[in-house]
Amino acid sequence: MEDKAQYVFALLGILATLYFVRWSTDPLRHIPAIGPSAPIVSYLSAYRYCRNAQSILQEGYHKYKVFRVSLVDRWVVVVSGADMNEELRKVPDTHVSFQEAADDLIQLKYTIAPDVNEHPIHTPVIRGPLTRNLGALFPDVVDEINVAFPELMPPAAKRGDWVAVSVRDTMGRIVSRASNRIFVGLPLCRNPDYLKTVVEFAFSVAKSRTIINAAPAVFRPIVGHFLPWAKRAVRNAGVHVKPLIRLRVSKMQDAGDDQTDKSCDYLMWLIEEAQKTKQNLDIVVQGILVSNFAAIHTSSNSITHSLLNLAAYPQHVQPLREEIEGIIKEYGWTKEAIGKMWKLDSFMRESQRLSGISGISVMRKVLQDITLSDGTYLPKGTLVVAAAFATHTDERYYENPEVFEPFRFYDMRTENDALRKQYVNTSREFITFGHGKHACPGRFFAVNELKAMMAYIILHYDVKLEEGVSRPENVWIWHNISPASTKVLFRERQSKVQ
């Protein structure tokens, strides 16, 4: 019995020694940590970060130029301030990788699908033909918005009654309709079973990510294997999308060299990208799903934040409505018209400044050892990010940074400098979409879609919060930010511009 006890104590001693050696030789140990950093107790820091990421990121930002926060299985290095954001943006792709950082933080190979994670065919399509053809595609987006709102809003709102609406759920369904009008077209973009599949998938990614990130790295392949949502979505979406793919490919083959009548839309661009990279066409289904995740999850959150602000600050509705009415009367429902809505653009950018989708941005994984300008050494394998929310609430860059000022960016714009402060643009002080060449490529499509939806709402509905309810606080889980589930009251207006 004594021998067994001695073996146990010896084993514990060896483990403790290994932990101490690992901790004392950790190449990130020289970087200040927010919370306990010693072995074992660092898990307490990870728990605190899960529950209180906002305050932890703010604390680190105001204390240090570079600091680190704890996840379950690793440290994440965070840089503070606009200058460091810019420095991180400029590190060459030979030394850091955005894609590998996204893989680690979002666990794409488990939460999305392994094929499209390895061969992201959607990225060049979004960055290239989708963005170039937004003007031509925009009428379809507007048409779907005009059809979807009357169908999906509660009937009582049409009778002029105030009705409570679950904004995030309803906006998610409308975003999915408008986005899939571009992704897969009519009539599939209105198919209830298909839409249920893509919407559930879009919101399952966050759930899967939370589960995976809570598991130690060694167990993640096992946990990931049993996560059902991505596999189910690929299977169910394939039932609807694969016949379209086969039809397109068949027509291309029948046409031979004469491709003058070839479809010019998102689905065809994905097919062409898959063929160009010699991928099985099943990857196109995954590309459609990833596109839906990016469109539905982020856009439904963004427009929900904007609507909560619109309902909480009703004094700003009239100037927005007057701007939208005047521009629509002159230019119609066109992409050009949306671009001229400077006040609406400012309102939504300000909403995004205070209520982005994440408290961090400009994520990178170090591929080769680098040293930052302040002397901080980052070894290969380090995850490094910028503190987005803390930057956006820094009084060095924004006057009264904690206050929602809807026309803050409108007041900064002039005819000669109209573009720099528009919603879609990034800067070292505004990193909601990332910054630099790895900034979100879909932001041009998303911003135009969201502004069209907001313009439609402002012209067709009055909105307000329930009596005695103020703008609810956002919900933080880890560094991920979501709008609260508070309902917003809607009432259809009798006088509106068509």
Curated annotation (Swiss-Prot):
Keywords: Glycoprotein, Heme, Iron, Membrane, Metal-binding, Monooxygenase, Oxidoreductase, Transmembrane, Transmembrane helix. It comes from the Eukaryota. GO terms for cellular component: membrane. Its EC number is 1.-.-.-. GO terms for biological process: secondary metabolic process. Its main location: membrane. Its cofactor is heme. It is found in: Membrane. Glycans are attached at residue 425. Disulfide bonds: none annotated. GO terms for molecular function: heme binding; iron ion binding; monooxygenase activity; oxidoreductase activity, acting on paired donors, with incorporation or reduction of molecular oxygen. Heme binds at residue 440. Pathway: Secondary metabolite biosynthesis. It is a single-pass membrane protein. InterPro entries: Cyt_P450, Cyt_P450_CS, Cyt_P450_E_grp-I, Cyt_P450_sf. Cytochrome P450 monooxygenase that is able to use dehydroabietic acid and testosterone as substrates for oxidation, suggesting that the natural substrate(s) may be structurally related to steroid compounds. Belongs to the cytochrome P450 family. This is Cytochrome P450 monooxygenase 110. It comes from Postia placenta (strain ATCC 44394 / Madison 698-R).
